[in-house]
C-alpha cells in the first residue's frame, strides 16, 4: 500500500522541511488556491484532479518544492516568533505585566483566570517562560501549576522587595487527569517579580507546552 499521512501544508509553511522524493499532496480547492498565492512554494504541478459528481474540482493531487532562498525567510520568521510578547493581566488586585512566548491556544490571561476549562499552549517554545512583574509587592507562600499528561519540570524564581532571589523546582510525571503541582516557598515572601518556567521533558523545541492554570497563595 502507498504510505499516507493526514495533515496539511501548515508545518511546511511554518518550518523548512524538505519535501520527500515523489511526495504528493491531496488538497481541496481552497487549499490549492492558497498554495498558488504563497511565495514560499514553487514548481507547483497538478498531477491529477478528482472531480465532484457535478464536475467541479474536489481534490487536487499536487507536487511542489520550496522557492529559491526560502530558508532565509523561515529564519527571519522564526527569529520574530522568538521575540517575547508582553501583556497586562488583572491579578491579585492589580494590573500585572506578563512577558510570555508566542501562543497558539489561548490568551496569557487564561493561565490566571481560575478556570480549568481554559488553557494556554505555546506555538513552539519549550520551556514556557512567564515573567510577572508586580507594581505593588505581594505576599505569597506558594505557586501551583495545573498540568496535564506531559512529564514536566516546573521552576520558579522570585525576587523579593529587598532584591533577594529565591529559586524553587519541582518535577511531575504527568497524569491523564488534570492535576496540580505545588511549589511551597517554606515561608511568606514579599515578592516584586516571579519567573515561572514550565518545561516538557520528553520533547525538544519546537514543541507545544500546555498550562491550564497558575494559582498564587
What role is predicted for each listed range?
Residues 1-64, 127, 151-153, 172:
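Catalytic lumenal/periplasmic loop and adjoining terminal transmembrane helix
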Residues 9-14, 132, 180-183:
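A generic local structural motif
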Residues 20-23, 140, 191:
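A general structural motif
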Residues 26-29, 141-145:
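Hydrophobic beta-strand segments within beta-rich accessory/binding domains
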Residues 30-39, 68-72, 140, 203-205:
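Short, surface-exposed beta-strand/loop "edge" segments at domain boundaries and coil↔beta transitions
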Residues 66-136, 146-150, 213-217:
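Disordered, acidic Ser/Thr/Pro-rich linker "stalks" and the adjacent N-terminal cap
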Residues 126, 148-217:
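Trp- and acidic/polar-enriched beta-sheet ligand-binding modules for extracellular glycan
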Residues 130-139, 184-189:
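Extracellular and analogous surface-interaction loops
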